[in-house]
């Protein structure tokens, strides 16, 4: 039995789930009656995890956003992890949505502070885009997992490498 147990907190997105949500959103776009006759498009830039939505109507642009968000929720991706990058208008209305796939330093500090303030017997350290949590008892690690899930973060939190 190991004397210390640990796990990593990260915000990594499953790229395949992102792609699946994109495919499902495109399929729904093709079959929606209220979008017939209106030029609407959904594209995904997989490298940057950016959804590019465009429509000839501003109201339908919000419908496209709702479709994408609902498909992401069904695929298990936290909707708070999606940020609106830019909204452009002209002949076509465009909207770019970015999926957050890393813990930035501000959120890492917030998570680390919450863990330290909990008075649990754990050690946490920020390692780039991940936070390593170490404890002698697995119960303490599970309490930290529960604590982090309850924090109001705009990230898709995942726990990895529980040892």
From Swiss-Prot:
Pfam families: DUF520 (PF04461)
Cellular component GO terms, alphabetical: cytosol
Record family assignment: Belongs to the YajQ family.
Organism ancestry: Bacteria, Pseudomonadati, Campylobacterota, Epsilonproteobacteria, Campylobacterales
NCBIfam families for the chain: PRK05412.1 (NF003819)
GO MF entry, a single one: nucleotide binding
SUPFAM superfamilies assigned to the protein according to its UniProt record, in alphabetical order: YajQ-like
InterPro entries hit by this protein: DUF520, UPF0234-like_C, UPF0234_N, YajQ-like_sf
Annotated PANTHER family: UPF0234 PROTEIN YAJQ (PTHR30476:SF0)
Job of this protein: Nucleotide-binding protein.
Keywords from the named record: Nucleotide-binding
Name listed for the protein in its UniProt record: Nucleotide-binding protein CJE0423
